[in-house]
Amino acid sequence: MFKFDNLILASSSKQRLCLLNQLGVLPGEIVIPNIDESPLKKELPKIYSMRVAKEKVIKVSLLYPKRFILGADTVVCCGRKILPKAETEDQAFEILELISGRRHRVYTSVYLYVPGKKLHYRNVMTVVKIKRLSVKEINSYILSGEWKGKAGACNIQGNAGKFVISMNGSYSSVIGLPLYETYSILSQYFPI
């Protein structure tokens, strides 16, 4: 693993750091970009994901204009409805009930700020189908607490993985950072 002192990860996500480490990359610093992540009125999920990821990177780049900034955002949606990160057990139950037995889309956008105001980005869509969940399964999963802070209230690396019937797209993107796309951007500037 190589530490790149001039690379900042603009994220509070432990999963994103772990995925970045899988590429052999250790950022010099992690900065949490405190931005408003509320969707705009009638904003489509893909556009939302791209906007939020870009805003994270730009916010941190204003503090560190001479460093590379990597940021990402993941959003889960059913149709055009953006599903929030559940904040309560009741909200998690509603989200899980909504995606139960259905296909839903996961968009992850990744941005790299390059000193000099250049931005590179990629957006990845993955379609995930979850089995029809019983009330007992939903309640059991909620008790695990794994839904906290997760887009769509699902942690497919944990207990929710057993509910996934199919996935068409990038597994790492669903977790929070599309590895292939991130590698293709970073490898232009870093020896990875």
UniProtKB/Swiss-Prot annotation:
The protein's Enzyme Commission number: 3.6.1.9
Cofactor section: a divalent metal cation
GO MF entries: nucleoside triphosphate diphosphatase activity
GO CC aspect terms: cytoplasm
Catalysed conversion reaction: a ribonucleoside 5'-triphosphate + H2O = a ribonucleoside 5'-phosphate + diphosphate + H(+); a 2'-deoxyribonucleoside 5'-triphosphate + H2O = a 2'-deoxyribonucleoside 5'-phosphate + diphosphate + H(+)
GO biological process: nucleotide metabolic process
Enzyme class, UniProt record, top EC level: hydrolase
Active site residues according to the UniProt entry: D73
Keywords: Cytoplasm, Hydrolase, Nucleotide metabolism
Subcellular location: Cytoplasm
Domain of life, source organism: Bacteria
InterPro entries for the chain: ITPase-like_fam, Maf-like
A Pfam entry, by short name: Maf
Keyword Disulfide bond carried by entry: no
NCBIfam families noted in UniProt: maf, PRK14366.1
Family: Belongs to the Maf family.
Function, in words: Nucleoside triphosphate pyrophosphatase. May have a dual role in cell division arrest and in preventing the incorporation of modified nucleotides into cellular nucleic acids.
Protein's UniProt name: Nucleoside triphosphate pyrophosphatase
Organism the protein comes from: Ehrlichia ruminantium (strain Gardel)
